[in-house]
Amino acid sequence: MNNQGRSILAWAALFIFVILLFNVFQSDGLLGVRNNITFSDFLTRVDEKTINSVKIQGRVIEGTANDGSTFSTYSPDYPDLVNRLTSNDVNIEVVPLETRMNTFLGFLISWFPMLLLIGVWVFFMRQMHGGGKAMGFGKSKARLLSDKGPKITFKDVAGIDEAKEELTEIVDFLRDPSKFQKLGGKIPKGCLLIGPPGTGKTLLAKAIAGEANVPFFSISGSDFVEMFVGVGASRVRDMFEQGKRNAPCIIFIDEIDAVGRHRGIGMGGGNDEREQTLNQMLVEMDGFEANEGVVIIAATNRPDVLDRALLRPGRFDRQIAVANPDINGREQILKVHLKKIKYNSTVLARIIARGTPGFSGAELANLVNEAALIAARLGKKEVDMHDMEEAKDKVLMGVVRRSIAMSEKEKRLTAYHEGGHALVGLYCPAASPIHKATIIPRGNALGMVQRLPETDEYSQNREQMESSIAVYMAGRVAEEIIFGRNKVTSGASSDIKGATNIARAMVTKAGLSDLIGPIFHGSNSDDMYGRQSSNEISEATAELIDAEVKRIITQGYEFAKDILTKHIDQLHTLANALIEYETLSGQQIKNLLSGRALDSEEENKFPFNDSHTIKIDKENLHEKVKSTKDKKENIIS
């Protein structure tokens, strides 16, 4: 049993003992009173001369009958009582009121409720603050990592070799500082791990704890600030005091943006609780008092909101980017996680890594776990490649919703919609390859076409972005061609949103609009209130941007319409196949449209000799520029 359990049992036993003690002292036996009678009954017994003696204390009368039994009663203001007792030969003993009960016992009984409340309050205060002092609000919540249990080391971290190298140097410094001090080097005071969610920042911190033979404290950024003023600053001071007592040591602060946001005019004024906490942290990290041997490692996925004073050298000397892994990194991560499950020889980490571009380490771990769950659900003894593919589809496209009963009309419309996406994607060489097309409802969609790039992409050119817009618009175009303009549904709303986002990014951020030019009109980083702020642009420029976005989307729409109109027979073939099979892989779609067997594994490159390329209508563009100039003079010089 842990210390907290023993403490609760001890307090419970003490509470029960005091209650029992109180009841015993209140019981009749301890006070010599066994039978309460009415005053009228008492007078009757006196007159019948059945009472031997009485003891009077104030208005309380306790007596003994001739047969040895005891009794008690309460006397009203009755002046003739003594005369009546003496006339009936009753022995009378008068006891002073203040000596009836032991002084300490009386004090205990009278103050028992108050003492009980104080005891309960002290108990809960100790439990809330880890068994420390009753007023332990300002105590740090940093937890010292226990040596018990399995350790995570750098061998368990894969796919982020650069970050591991930077942090390995810090671990080596803590193990053998003289190696670096010989050359005059100083240990870094802090390292900030920056990266999107799921890339392994916290896992790296756990690996450092497993590698470094020094005390390792961990705390969350949200653990500092509470409702009481001054608590956060006090906890920061106490945390660094803990670090000094255990130096050399490492303190890991997860999600530091919860306390390290840049200072400004907040809701509580410029001196609010969070800012006091941040100010104290700045002083402790690099103030007048040195904290030699205390290394701060923090993690965040929002470096843009952190205060600049926190990021300067001397506080966080190193900022280590932890990005999503490339194909080699994904393969290494998959191998680490595959060690934890049973799988057969069909599972190839390289193939899975190639089909999961953009996946973070956490997503890859989830994919492997989902595959194991799928295999267990099917009663298999080992995970095979089919389970991995099914898990990938579940992660990418969502859970299959077989409970939705689609009518034949809806199924046919969905088949043409998804067939339009797939067909235009095949005829756009710059578009990402088709991974799978399905009309089985998954997630929030009735059907979808999943595209995956063959390699990791870190940027996109104009042709790729315009091809993506055309693929987005192809579903709506297919509905319009097959069912007519009045039968177009709202199912393309998410496609329109995706196309609009790409087109607006081309115009406002990437400088890919000939009309607007290479000028940035996107949003800046968050302001002091945490809101997105944007550059100051005129109303006329905003209209130009909207016109360019519309032109790019319309261009993609017309391009998709041209492809689908020209290859209408293939659209019918693909839609009918989707209605029959419900799900087709990218290779099956190519086989289908090339006249091969659907499940042929023969290498089959779809004939791109008839592929289309988006061409900008220069004449139309110049006409738009001219008309805009006529409408808004002096906008573009």
Curated annotation (Swiss-Prot):
Q: Which GO terms describe its biological process?
A: protein catabolic process; proteolysis
Q: Which domain of life is it from?
A: Bacteria
Q: Which residues lie on this side of the membrane: Periplasmic?
A: 28-103
Could you say which cofactors this protein requires?
Zn(2+)
What the protein does comes down to: Acts as a processive, ATP-dependent zinc metallopeptidase for both cytoplasmic and membrane proteins. Plays a role in the quality control of integral membrane proteins.
Q: Which InterPro entries match?
A: AAA+_ATPase, AAA_lid_3, ATPase_AAA_core, ATPase_AAA_CS, FtsH, P-loop_NTPase, Pept_M41_FtsH_extracell, Peptidase_M41
Cofactor note as given: Binds 1 zinc ion per subunit.
Q: How does it assemble?
A: Homohexamer.
The residues listed in the UniProt record as binding ATP, with positions renumbered to this chain, are G195, P196, P197, G198, T199, G200, K201, T202
Write down what this protein is called: ATP-dependent zinc metalloprotease FtsH
Q: Which residues lie on this side of the membrane: Cytoplasmic?
A: 1-6, 125-637
For membrane topology, the record states:
Multi-pass membrane protein
Gene Ontology MF terms in the entry: ATP binding; ATP hydrolysis activity; ATP-dependent peptidase activity; metalloendopeptidase activity; zinc ion binding
Q: Which UniProt keywords apply?
A: ATP-binding, Cell inner membrane, Cell membrane, Hydrolase, Membrane, Metal-binding, Metalloprotease, Nucleotide-binding, Protease, Transmembrane, Transmembrane helix, Zinc
Q: Which organism is it from?
A: Rickettsia prowazekii (strain Madrid E)
- Stated EC number for the protein is 3.4.24.-
Residues annotated as catalytic: E418
What GO cellular component entries does it have? plasma membrane
State where Zn(2+) binds.
H417, H421, D495
Localization annotation? Cell inner membrane
- Residue intervals passing through the bilayer: 7-27, 104-124
Would you identify the family this protein belongs to, as annotated? In the central section; belongs to the AAA ATPase family. In the C-terminal section; belongs to the peptidase M41 family.
